Design a protein with these regions (language model features):
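Mid-length scaffold segments of soluble, non-membrane domains
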Residues: 65, 69-98, 110-118
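Short phosphate-binding/catalytic loops that engage adenosine nucleotides
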Residues: 72, 138-139, 156
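Flexible, polar/low-complexity N-terminal or interdomain linker segments that lie immediately upstream
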Residues: 2-73, 80-85
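Catalytic cysteine-centered active loop of the rhodanese-like fold, especially the PTP/DSP P-loop
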Residues: 100, 105-151
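Active-site neighborhoods of enzymes that stabilize oxyanions during catalysis
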Residues: 155-162
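A short, well-structured beta->alpha microelement
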Residues: 59, 95-102
Length: 162
């Protein structure tokens, strides 16, 4: 490649990156440079289950137990094959996000809080699903990071498909 052409490409690329970065920084609501970690909630006292500002927050086992006992909707983000091992009582599951979104909206609407979980701390499916559902208009999503592993190893109630 010709050195003059290479310098021109490098210059144009550099100017483009600089303009994009400047615009993003100066713009209201620009894209964050680093991902913000989810807010962690350690008590049901800190949770409002009816909000209208989009929010995805992380909860621990104790909070998940309290919410489940109070009838909060749980969504299992694991693939259907994993449900044979059991799931949190009352949890719903559907690998089709459109159908799942419709089911959640029918059951609780868009502003009431619900919990999403997957297999364990390392499973990203619950977060991915939470952000997907947020795009559908759900405002108050709680992610139980410990997931199925923490729940089942704690000896809590388990439900099985019949």
């Amino acid at each position: 490649m010709d050195i003059k052409l290479f310098k021109q490409v490098l210059l144009i690329t550099g100017i483009s990156v600089l303009c994009g970065a400047s615009f993003n920084t100066l713009r209201d609501g620009g894209i964050a440079w680093l991902a913000k970690p989810m807010e962690k909630i350690n008590s049901t006292n800190n949770i409002e289950l009816n909000i209208d500002v989009p929010s995805v927050r992380e909860i621990n086992l104790e909070t998940a137990m309290n919410l489940q006992q109070n009838g909060t909707l749980f969504v299992d983000a694991r693939s259907e094959e994993y449900l044979e091992d059991g799931f949190i009582p009352g949890a719903i599951n559907n690998e089709d996000t459109d159908a799942l979104s419709d089911e959640i909206a029918t059951l609780i609407g868009f502003d009431k809080g619900f919990v999403i979980y997957c297999s364990d701390d390392d499973c990203g499916s619950s977060e991915d699903l939470a952000y997907d559902l947020q795009e559908y208009g759900f405002n108050n999503i709680l992610v139980f990071k410990g997931g199925w592993k923490t729940w089942s190893e704690s000896g809590l109630d388990i439900e099985y498909n019949e």
